[in-house]
């Protein structure tokens, strides 16, 4: 987790499977 602190933020609110499902990974990075 220390590698990407940004992932820890969204992970707190929603699970990891919900991130890629909604495309949050691309939207958050964009």
UniProtKB/Swiss-Prot annotation:
A motif (SPKK motif 1) lies at residues 4-7. One of its GO terms (molecular function) is DNA binding. Monoubiquitination gives a specific tag for epigenetic transcriptional activation and is also prerequisite for histone H3 'Lys-4' and 'Lys-79' methylation. Phosphorylated on SPKK motifs 3 and 4; which may regulate DNA binding. Dephosphorylated during maturation of spermatids to mature sperm and rephosphorylated at fertilization. Residues 9-30 have a biased composition (Basic residues). The keyword Membrane does not apply. A motif (SPKK motif 2) lies at residues 9-12. Its main location: nucleus. Core component of nucleosome. Nucleosomes wrap and compact DNA into chromatin, limiting DNA accessibility to the cellular machineries which require DNA as a template. Histones thereby play a central role in transcription regulation, DNA repair, DNA replication and chromosomal stability. DNA accessibility is regulated via a complex set of post-translational modifications of histones, also called histone code, and nucleosome remodeling. Belongs to the histone H2B family. Contains 4 SPKK motifs which may interact with the minor groove of A/T-rich DNA sites. Phosphorylation of this motif may regulate DNA binding. This motif is reiterated in both termini of histone H1 and in the C-terminus of plant H2A, but its presence in the N-terminus seems to be unique to sea urchin histones H2B. This is Histone H2B.2, sperm. It comes from Echinus esculentus.
């Amino acid at each position: 987790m220390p590698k990407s602190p940004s992932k820890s933020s969204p992970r707190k609110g929603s699970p990891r499977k919900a991130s890629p499902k909604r495309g949050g990974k691309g939207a958050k990075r964009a």
